[in-house]
From Swiss-Prot:
GO biological process, one term: rRNA base methylation
Swiss-Prot/TrEMBL catalytic activity: adenosine(2503) in 23S rRNA + 2 reduced [2Fe-2S]-[ferredoxin] + 2 S-adenosyl-L-methionine = 2-methyladenosine(2503) in 23S rRNA + 5'-deoxyadenosine + L-methionine + 2 oxidized [2Fe-2S]-[ferredoxin] + S-adenosyl-L-homocysteine; adenosine(37) in tRNA + 2 reduced [2Fe-2S]-[ferredoxin] + 2 S-adenosyl-L-methionine = 2-methyladenosine(37) in tRNA + 5'-deoxyadenosine + L-methionine + 2 oxidized [2Fe-2S]-[ferredoxin] + S-adenosyl-L-homocysteine
Name used for this protein in its record: Dual-specificity RNA methyltransferase RlmN
Function: Specifically methylates position 2 of adenine 2503 in 23S rRNA and position 2 of adenine 37 in tRNAs. m2A2503 modification seems to play a crucial role in the proofreading step occurring at the peptidyl transferase center and thus would serve to optimize ribosomal fidelity.
More info: Reaction proceeds by a ping-pong mechanism involving intermediate methylation of a conserved cysteine residue.
Binding-site list for [4Fe-4S] cluster: 141, 145, 148
Pfam family, one: RlmN_N
Residue positions of the active site: 121 (proton acceptor), 379 (s-methylcysteine intermediate)
Protein family per UniProt: Belongs to the radical SAM superfamily. RlmN family.
Co-factor: note: Binds 1 [4Fe-4S] cluster. The cluster is coordinated with 3 cysteines and an exchangeable S-adenosyl-L-methionine.
Length: 399
């Protein structure tokens, strides 16, 4: 397979310091926008109206300049432009798979929340009836799941809510998903039908170890006056941070996905080391108690198919037994290889037999079609260049 790569800016530009640059308002919550307006002296009596105007232009219209905001007074636009921008984070690379999947490597400049440059990957997966954006919630990951490429990258920091939301703004910019605006690269479509219909927190990081920012991000993503994504089309995937599950359900109303991958603790301890802290029985009880779980809002259990490891008929039957009483569907994921891994994907016939056992027991058990494998954009393949970036920064500091 081949893929095309768009280099937005030279990688060497990573060493520039953007900490002193004007702050961007793109990605802020309503409270954040209101605080910015107060900074430039906007009257408190106008705060609600002015915040609503900014919200509409940033999130509904995708404005890239304050000059685009035609119903905002020229005086206010000038004041905003003197202090702030609507700039997006830097796109280091964009890769387009032969199947249409796109992967962006995004660089975040230092900010008030963090003095570190950082990079993450996010992925857009177009399909016939939907378009799914897979977003990252952390730079690197603490969980070291043995089958996951991200797990080989050291944890650097949490992403802010603004940085999470910026991933969607960038995607909508690039593919032309804001009404009336052409794609930034000329390759997308702005025909009027929404291109990003679903958001999945299945990129880099464990969302529940960054829950406050994930909660704020979901509130912006689902706001009906802006990005307007249904909470039923927002899925948060977790390896099983059991104490945080009730809070996730109560504060977001998002759909839940569990990275299960094994039906016995001794194996899951290896595949998902977090299991040593929160074993399968505790995790599944938390799922039974998850706020809002029902046949209409089923919990998705993700199960990566590893050859000779977790793919036997007895594993399938045990999975069915474990999930009894939980409104669930099982997403079977053919393992996606990455450089240095020792795992292999189960054979197609083995996956089909596993799926049949689960399906015949009454559970939906779709086999996920791998997308973006040729650009390392498929499930479990994401890993940013942040480690190299940190090394370059240290070299520059020593010069």
């Amino acid at each position: 397979m081949t893929s095309s790569t768009l280099l937005e800016t030279p990688a060497a530009a990573a060493d520039h310091d953007c900490a002193s640059a004007p702050r961007s308002l793109a990605g802020l919550t309503r409270d954040g926008l209101a605080a910015a307006l107060l900074e430039i002296g906007a009257p408190e009596r106008e705060l609600r109206m002015r915040t609503a105007q900014l919200w509409h232009w940033i999130y509904h219209r995708g404005a890239g300049s304050f000059d685009d905001m035609l119903n905002v007074s020229k005086v206010l636009r000038t004041q905003l432009a003197e202090k702030f921008t609507l700039a997006r984070p830097q796109i280091v690379t964009e890769q387009v798979s032969t199947d249409g999947t796109r992967k962006w490597l995004i660089r975040f400049a230092p900010s008030a929340e963090s003095d570190r440059l950082a990079e993450v990957e996010c992925v857009y997966i177009p399909d016939v009836d939907r378009g799914t954006l897979c977003v990252s919630s952390q730079v690197g990951c603490t969980l070291t799941c043995s089958f996951c490429h991200t797990g080989t990258q050291k944890f650097v920091r949490n992403l802010t809510a603004q940085e999470i939301i910026a991933q969607l703004i960038i995607a909508r910019d690039r593919i032309g998903d804001f009404p009336g605006l052409a794609p930034r690269d000329g390759k997308g479509s702005n025909s009027g039908s929404r291109l990003v219909t679903n958001i999945v927190f299945m990129g880099m990081g464990e969302p529940l170890y960054n829950l406050d920012n994930v909660v704020d991000a979901v509130s912006v993503l689902s706001d009906g006056d802006g990005l307007s994504l249904s909470r039923r089309r927002i899925t948060v995937s977790t390896a099983g941070v059991v104490p945080k599950l009730p809070e996730l359900g109560e504060k977001t109303g998002a759909m839940l996905a569990i990275s299960l991958h094994a039906v016995r603790d001794e194996l899951r301890n290896t595949l998902v080391p977090l299991n040593k802290k929160y074993p399968i029985a505790a995790l599944l009880q938390a799922c039974r108690d998850y706020p809002g779980a029902s046949n209409a809002r089923r919990i998705t259990f993700e199960y990566v198919m590893l050859k000779g490891i977790n793919d036997s008929p007895s594993d399938a039957r045990e999975l069915v037994r474990l999930l009894k009483g939980i409104p669930a569907k099982i997403n079977l994921i053919p393992f996606n290889p990455w450089p240095g891994t020792a795992y292999e994907c189960s054979d197609d016939a083995v996956i089909e037999k596993f799926s049949d056992i689960v399906f015949n027991a009454g559970y939906a058990s779709p086999v996920r079609t791998p997308r973006g494998r040729d650009i390392l954009a498929a499930c479990g393949q994401l890993k940013s260049e942040t480690e190299k970036l940190r090394a370059r920064a240290l070299l520059v500091a020593g010069d």
